[in-house]
C-alpha cells in the first residue's frame, strides 16, 4: 500500500470520511485543510450514473463560473483575416491560421489551456487530433470552441467559462476556484457549476444522474457533500 506523508495523514484526520457535509461546512473544511505552499485549486468531483459505453450519454460541454477559476487562462485561436483580428482584440494569447497548425505539428506546441477555431479552419486542424485530443484541447462544437464568434468565445473563456467532460469512469471534475477565494465566491461557483451540470443530464440516463458529490483541494482529501443540501439551497 502507498505510504502517505505526515501532512496528508494530519489532513485526513480532520475529515470524517463517513460524514456528508453541508456545502458551507465542506468549503470551510477544504480551506482549512489546504496547507500546501501554493494556492491550491478547489475541485468539484461529480460521480454520475451515465453509461460511458454509450456515445449519446457522454457529457461534454462548458460551464461558466461567476467568479472564474482564479487561474490565468491561455487561449489559442485558429482563425484568419478579420476573425483573427477580432480574436487578438478580445485578448487571445495565440492567434493564427495554417502557420499555427504547422507550429503545433512540428514543435508539439501545447502551451495553452483552450483552443478555439472558426469552422473554416477545422479541415486544416483535423490532423492535430493526435496531439490535441489526448490533452482535451481539440476544438469542438459541443464545447463551444468551434464558432464564428471568436470574440465572444475568447472573452467567455478568459472570464470563467471552462470545458467539462466525463472521464472513463463517468466522473466529471470541475475546478471551482482557489483556496484563497472567500467562502461566498467558492459557494457561488460550486452551486453554479452543479446546477449547470444537472441541466446537461443526457436523456437516456436511468435513475439518479449525480450519484456522489465530493469537494477537495489539489493536495487535500475528498470531502463528501450532502446532495440534499445542494438541492435545497
UniProtKB/Swiss-Prot annotation:
A GO CC term attached to the entry: large ribosomal subunit
GO molecular function, one term: rRNA binding
InterPro entries referenced in this protein's UniProt entry, alphabetically: Ribosom_uL1_bac-type (IPR005878), Ribosomal_uL1 (IPR002143), Ribosomal_uL1-like (IPR023674), Ribosomal_uL1/biogenesis (IPR028364), Ribosomal_uL1_3-a/b-sand (IPR016095), Ribosomal_uL1_CS (IPR023673)
Keywords: Repressor, Ribonucleoprotein, Ribosomal protein, RNA-binding, rRNA-binding, Translation regulation, tRNA-binding
SUPFAM superfamilies: Ribosomal protein L1
Record's signal peptide: none
GO biological process: regulation of translation; translation
Highest taxon of source: Bacteria
Family: Belongs to the universal ribosomal protein uL1 family.
Subunit structure: Part of the 50S ribosomal subunit.
Function: Binds directly to 23S rRNA. The L1 stalk is quite mobile in the ribosome, and is involved in E site tRNA release. Protein L1 is also a translational repressor protein, it controls the translation of the L11 operon by binding to its mRNA.
Name of the protein: Large ribosomal subunit protein uL1
Organism field: Pseudothermotoga lettingae (strain ATCC BAA-301 / DSM 14385 / NBRC 107922 / TMO) (Thermotoga lettingae)
Amino acid at each position: 500500500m502507498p505510504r502517505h506523508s505526515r501532512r496528508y495523514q494530519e489532513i485526513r484526520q480532520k475529515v470524517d470520511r463517513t460524514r456528508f457535509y453541508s456545502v458551507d461546512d465542506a468549503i470551510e473544511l477544504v480551506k482549512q485543510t489546504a496547507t500546501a505552499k501554493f494556492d491550491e485549486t478547489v475541485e468539484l468531483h461529480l460521480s454520475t450514473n451515465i453509461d460511458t459505453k454509450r456515445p449519446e450519454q457522454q457529457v461534454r460541454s462548458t460551464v461558466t463560473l461567476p467568479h472564474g477559476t482564479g487561474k490565468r487562462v491561455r487561449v489559442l485561436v485558429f482563425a484568419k483575416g478579420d476573425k483573427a483580428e477580432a480574436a487578438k482584440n478580445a485578448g487571445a494569447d495565440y492567434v493564427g491560421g495554417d502557420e499555427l497548425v504547422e507550429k503545433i505539428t512540428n514543435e508539439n506546441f501545447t502551451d495553452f489551456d483552450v483552443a478555439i477555431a472558426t469552422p473554416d479552419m477545422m479541415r486544416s486542424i483535423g490532423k492535430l487530433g493526435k496531439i490535441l485530443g489526448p490533452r482535451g484541447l481539440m476544438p469542438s462544437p459541443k464545447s463551444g470552441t468551434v464558432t464564428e464568434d471568436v470574440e465572444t468565445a475568447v472573452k467567455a473563456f478568459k472570464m470563467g467559462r471552462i470545458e467539462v467532460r466525463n472521464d472513463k469512469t463517468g466522473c466529471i471534475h470541475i475546478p471551482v476556484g482557489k483556496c484563497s477565494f472567500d467562502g461566498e465566491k467558492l459557494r457561488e461557483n460550486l452551486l453554479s457549476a452543479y446546477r449547470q451540470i444537472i441541466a446537461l443530464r443526457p436523456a437516456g440516463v436511468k435513475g439518479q444522474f449525480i450519484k456522489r458529490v465530493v469537494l477537495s483541494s489539489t493536495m487535500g482529501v475528498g470531502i463528501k457533500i450532502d446532495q440534499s443540501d445542494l438541492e435545497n439551497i
